[in-house]
Amino acid sequence: MQLTTLLTGLISVLSVTTAIPMGSESPTPTSSVSKSLIAHSSSASVSASPTPSPNPYEAYTCPKDKFKACCMSVQQTGKDIVKQLGDLVPVLSGLQVSSAISFQCKNMTEREAPDSCNGQGYTPMCCNTKVEDTGFNTCKPFEDVKKAYYMNNMKDIPESQADMIMDILT
């Protein structure tokens, strides 16, 4: 007797909380108030998000006046050397090398994904000049430049609901 009462109570609570109609087989019409609330909230979320860029490959590009290249960097070369030295001398294993100098750059197009720069010792960079040779160039790692760009340029734009959800999930 108590089991049937418990099951009936659970089913009624579930039907109320999930808003699944139990008795009616035909859908009920939506009220105009809820339609106006939905329309108002969707227009607010659209206006709050930044306008889409005309360039669909914006995530792959460097900021204005910078050029994307796949370069061997002093920083990457230094990391490789320090890693090998760190295996021999453990004190050196935590040492970090930081440098904006890069060499052996190969220019990349806007549409090329940064991940396509995957040769050993090569990393995607945003460089000051568009020089493709074995000479030296002043470059910064692509990820660092993009992160700094978005932190500086997107700080005043409110985050969209989709961005908030992605931040929570990741």
Swiss-Prot record:
Its main location: secreted. Keywords: Cell wall, Disulfide bond, Secreted, Signal. It comes from the Eukaryota. Disulfide bonds join 62-126, 70-117, 71-105, 127-139. Residues 1-19 form the signal peptide. Disruption phenotype: Affects hydrophobicity only when HfbC, HfbD and HfbF are also deleted. Disruption of all 7 hydrophobins leads to altered germination kinetics, decreased survival under exposure to extreme cold stress and increased mycotoxins patulin and citrinin production. It is found in: Secreted; Secreted, Cell wall. Aerial growth, conidiation, and dispersal of filamentous fungi in the environment rely upon a capability of their secreting small amphipathic proteins called hydrophobins (HPBs) with low sequence identity. Class I can self-assemble into an outermost layer of rodlet bundles on aerial cell surfaces, conferring cellular hydrophobicity that supports fungal growth, development and dispersal; whereas Class II form highly ordered films at water-air interfaces through intermolecular interactions but contribute nothing to the rodlet structure. Belongs to the fungal hydrophobin family. This is Class I hydrophobin E. The gene is HfbE.
